[in-house]
Amino acid sequence: MRLTRRVFSHSLLGTGLAGVLGPPALAQSGPAEGVHYVRLAEPAPAGPPGKIEVIEFFWYECPHCHAFEPALEAWAKRQPDDVAFRRVPVWFREEPFSAQQRLFYALEALELLPTLHRKVFFAIHNERTRLRTAEDLSAFALKNGVDPLKFVAAYNSFTVQSKSLQARQIAAAYKIDAVPAMGVHGRYYTNGTLANAGAERGSNDRMLGVVDALIAKVRQGNRA
């Protein structure tokens, strides 16, 4: 239940496991390393000091990312203070990824992600709106009540360009080749295929159970 770099390059469509379920339980023994998640050979940057960082890697045009968003958002709201959650838009090649990466960080700079992040998904997947060029994105901003001059200034800003580059670097550190995927504290990585190993039916929501177990694992290690 993911969109891979290979699948994107052939068809721009995800091919995944069937069915989106409620958050399914893992086996009683919990997720297994090398089966439901992998440990990074070289740790990635771990985020804010004193926090357990969790990253979702996504792409706005990925239908599985769109379907995953409600469960992910609800999960994020339940996290305690020691968990720092953030999203990272991926880049597999220049177009159409660059423009949508910069869109995300422009909305972040304008403090509009809480209101417009889900609307970007809705525009692409429900309204079939093309959001692949600066002109497309400016029109989207205007339609949603954003001053187009402020949007363009943010979109072209050094801050947004720098964050887009950093996003590519962190995705490379986690060796991301499919979305949606999740990284935990610079140490662990899982995606829909891994999280659903051995399951009769697949759901990206199962990633959240794996991530919960990995957060507990990091937390226990920090206390040791």
Sequence positions of predicted segments:
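Solvent-exposed loop/turn segments at secondary-structure junctions
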Residues: 61-64, 91-95, 123-127, 159-160, ...
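Structural microenvironment flanking redox-active thiols in thiol-disulfide oxidoreductases
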Residues: 78-109, 113-142
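Periplasmic c-type cytochrome electron-transfer domains
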Residues: 30-40, 129, 134, 201-211
